[in-house]
Amino acid sequence: KVLFYDFINQHFDFPSTSTMSDGARECVIRSYGLSDEMINKEADKWLLQWIDAEYKLFKAFETKFYGDRLRTPFESMDELIAFSNTLLNRRKSRAGKSLEHHLARIFTCADLRFEAQVVTEDNKKPDFIFPGGREYHDKSFPKDKLVCLGAKTPCKDRWRQVLNEAGE
C-alpha cells in the first residue's frame, strides 16, 4: 500500500495508460521482489496480479481526481451524462491498453521478439506481431514463422475487431 500511495502522490493529473500500467506493475514487482525468471515461471499469475493492482490504482486515482466532484450536485442531466461518459470512456480505454502493456512486459521477460501496434495492410494494427513488423512486411519471410496476436478484453465485446485485424 505504501508503494501505491507514493505512486499516487507523485501525480497531479491522471497518468497515461502506460504510466499507470508501469506503476502498478512496479508496485507488485517490488512488493514481491520479482525477477524476470519468477515472472516467466508464473506469467498468468503475475498478469492477473498486475491487472488487479492497476484496477485498484486506477480507482484510487478516480477518487483523488473526481471524488470532490461527485460530492457536488450536478446542475443538469447533460452535465451528469457528460461527466459519466468521461469516466466510462477512460475506464474502457484503460482496460484494453492495460492488458497490452502487461503482456508486452511478459513477452520482454521471456525474451520474445515482438512489435506492438504494427501498421499492416489497410492501415490495420494488430496488438502484437511476432517477431516484428519488418518480418511481417518482408514478402520472403516465411509466413508460418509469423504470429499476430489481438489482446482484447473482454473478448465477447471485441470479436468483430479481432476478425477485422486478422483480415477475415
Where are these predicted regions, by residue range?
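Interdomain/boundary linker segments immediately adjacent to catalytic/signaling cores
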Residues: 6-97
